[in-house]
């Protein structure tokens, strides 16, 4: 790995020291994120080998630990345990199973549990539901898989006290507090080598084909489950299955559908989290020559794997457990940077003194902006903007043009304008406002104000998107900042990388800036490789073909989970020579590219914006892709000038001994 790439990877990860009542090193404790808090429950102390039922809480913003001390009159904590599961359901933490002391409380006598305990996150108290006996009640187990979806808790696999795998799946209704379903499993699943996840909340609108977890004749499944497992770590086998525990016991196998430039190695005690349309797989990778904590991402739309390259940070020290901080699009890896990973793994020890924070957005992994209103409401907003009779103010642009608008509508979403308007109330009548932007940028800004979305082709020109992000930063418009950042991610290519880099640097969008910088470095690396290839060619031909810009050998795909066209230069339809002036200008230019575009430059390049849940893009073959107004028209786009840019395993039934 080159030093340049190494330094870029290191920009995405930072190590911080936690403080407060830091949990001691634990074995088999559960870690669950709720909001901006991480809850660590139970586990076995490494120092004394005693199990605990302590609850530690970490504020993910301040990185300060506190230990929960219950009120004297509140219910006691559950029995000490380890290798249990804890899932989030609304305002409750749901704890199931695990290994604990037998009733005699002898450290030499252990047992597996089958109980369900609830922790109320609002009252900060424990609750023990009265569960009626059921034929679907699960067998006691530990080191199992558990996933919560809607109001169902699904428990599958795990081991008994003889270290035998339990080939059973059970479903618990968290509303009625009863076991409602059970069945047999044909495979062995456990926390040592598998993860389960429920993709019911994944946004499928961006997927060009039906999600792999849905039946062809069943468009919607209330409780789809997916299980990824890896085993035989010397020659790793990777399995991916999907099934519906409530409707069918049949597992659909998707193992052969997974692909990627490289695939995950065998990860021990893996964990899985969902963010956007990706499943994040993390775990410990150990070989005689390599030991580190790995983070991988599976694109659920096309089942392509990519590695999240965190540089050299996670290659040193002992990093043991990762959790997703979804609200901030970041991944937290806990450990101790001064300890040895192999030694801690042999004791199954998890440390909480240090945390490595990985910026996932820099790899194109993030939650897409959600719609705030229906498409018909967005269209109605555009219609209002295009109706001069509803205007009571005139917006004057810096290129001498005007746009009639309604001040009440603008004031609802633009607080700065509302304050300016309140100062002029003593002067009723038609008003005018000078806006220091060009007409195309001003119109795109007003289209956002009226629709709360970026939905027109006008708004998705790269130059206009850059100015919209700057305006969002200047006027503190969080919604516009979110939408513009997302749109810039989608149109990030070699051609737009320098402009996106500069705009993100000006507006403090660090993740977008790092991603754009990676594209530029990859472009420069590609150009250098092309030059070397030309020099090493002993018999050059007059008309020589050079490697295609979208050649996989040119760009390592582990840097992004977006389509290769976004970062690998896939948008070139022809092969380019090393003397390509466009690439040379890109890799060497330091000039400003975020100035307000002139109309002539704006309309010569019309990208095809990527449709996402946050934008319903009008894609028409006719030139003006937004409604015309009666007072002032956007210059027409000549058809011959419009060019598109790509946006965006079996073994004996013997378990693992702990």
Task: List the predicted regions and their residue ranges.
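Conserved blade-ending motifs and adjacent loop-strand segments that build the rim/top face
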Residues: 183-193, 252-270, 301-327, 372-379
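N-terminal BTB/POZ boundary and linker segment
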Residues: 352, 359-405, 451-463, 551, ...
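Beta-propeller blade signature
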Residues: 52-64, 107-125, 166-178, 236-249, ...
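A short helix->beta-strand "capping" segment at the edge of beta-propeller domains
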Residues: 2-23, 69, 130, 255
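Canonical BTB/POZ domain core
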Residues: 392-493
């Amino acid at each position: 790995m080159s030093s340049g790439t190494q330094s870029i990877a290191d920009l995405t990860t930072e190590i911080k020291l936690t403080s407060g009542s830091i949990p001691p090193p634990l074995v088999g404790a559960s870690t669950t994120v709720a909001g901006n808090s991480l809850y660590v429950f139970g586990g076995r102390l490494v120092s004394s080998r005693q199990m605990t039922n302590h609850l530690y809480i970490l504020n993910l913003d301040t990185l300060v630990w506190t230990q929960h001390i219950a009120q004297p009159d509140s219910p006691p904590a559950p029995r000490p345990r380890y290798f249990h599961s804890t899932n989030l359901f609304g305002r409750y933490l749901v704890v199931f199973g695990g290994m604990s002391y037998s009733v005699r409380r002898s450290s030499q006598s252990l047992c597996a549990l089958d109980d369900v305990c609830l922790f109320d996150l609002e009252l900060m108290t424990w609750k023990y539901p009265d569960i009626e006996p059921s034929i679907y009640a699960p067998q006691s187990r530990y080191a199992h898989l558990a996933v919560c979806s809607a109001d169902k808790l699904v428990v599958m696999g795990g081991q008994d006290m003889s270290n035998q795998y339990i080939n059973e799946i059970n479903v618990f209704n968290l509303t009625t507090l009863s076991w409602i379903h059970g069945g047999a499993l044909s495979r062995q699943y456990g926390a040592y080598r598998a993860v389960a996840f429920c993709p019911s909340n994944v946004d499928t609108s961006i997927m060009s084909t039906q999600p792999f977890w849905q039946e062809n004749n069943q468009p919607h499944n209330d409780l789809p489950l997916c299980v990824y497992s890896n085993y035989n770590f010397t020659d790793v086998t990777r399995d991916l299955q999907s099934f519906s525990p409530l409707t069918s016991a049949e597992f659909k196998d998707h193992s052969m559908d997974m692909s990627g430039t490289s695939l995950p190695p065998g990860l021990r005690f893996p964990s899985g989290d969902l963010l956007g349309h990706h499943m994040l797989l993390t775990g410990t990778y150990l070989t005689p020559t390599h030991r580190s904590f790995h983070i991988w991402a599976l694109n659920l739309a096309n089942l392509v794997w990519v590695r999240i390259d965190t540089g050299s940070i996670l290659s040193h020290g002992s990093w043991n457990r990762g959790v997703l901080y979804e609200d901030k699009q970041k991944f937290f890896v806990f450990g101790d940077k001064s300890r040895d990973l192999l030694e801690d793994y042999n004791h199954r020890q998890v440390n909480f003194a240090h945390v490595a924070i990985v910026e996932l957005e820099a790899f194109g992994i993030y939650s897409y902006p959600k719609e705030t209103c229906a498409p018909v409401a967005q269209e109605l907003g555009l219609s209002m903007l295009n109706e001069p009779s509803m205007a009571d103010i005139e917006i004057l642009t810096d290129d001498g043009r005007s746009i009639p608008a309604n001040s009440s509508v603008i004031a609802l979403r633009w607080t700065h304008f509302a304050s300016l308007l309140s100062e002029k109330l003593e002067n009723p009548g038609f008003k005018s406002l000078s806006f220091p932007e060009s007409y195309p940028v001003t119109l795109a800004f007003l289209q956002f104000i009226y629709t709360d979305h970026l939905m027109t082709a006008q708004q998705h020109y790269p130059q206009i998107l850059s100015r919209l992000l700057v305006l969002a930063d200047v006027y503190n418009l969080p919604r516009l900042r979110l939408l513009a950042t997302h749109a810039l991610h989608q149109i990030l290519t070699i051609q737009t990388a320098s402009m996106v880099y500069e705009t993100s640097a000006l507006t403090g969008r660090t993740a977008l800036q790092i991603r754009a910088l990676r594209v530029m470095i990859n472009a420069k690396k590609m150009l250098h490789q092309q030059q070397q290839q030309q020099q090493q060619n002993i018999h050059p031909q007059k008309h020589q073909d050079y490697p295609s810009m979208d050649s996989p050998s040119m760009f390592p795909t582990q840097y992004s989970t977006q389509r290769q066209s976004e970062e690998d230069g896939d948008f070139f339809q022809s092969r380019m020579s090393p003397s390509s002036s466009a690439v040379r200008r890109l890799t060497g230019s330091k000039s400003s590219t975020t100035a307000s575009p002139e109309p002539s430059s704006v309309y010569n390049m019309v990208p095809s914006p990527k449709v996402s849940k946050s934008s319903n893009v009008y894609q028409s073959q006719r030139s003006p892709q937004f409604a015309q107004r009666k007072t002032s028209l956007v210059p027409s786009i000549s058809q011959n000038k419009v060019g598109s840019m790509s946006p965006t395993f079996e073994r004996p039934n013997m378990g693992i001994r702990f």
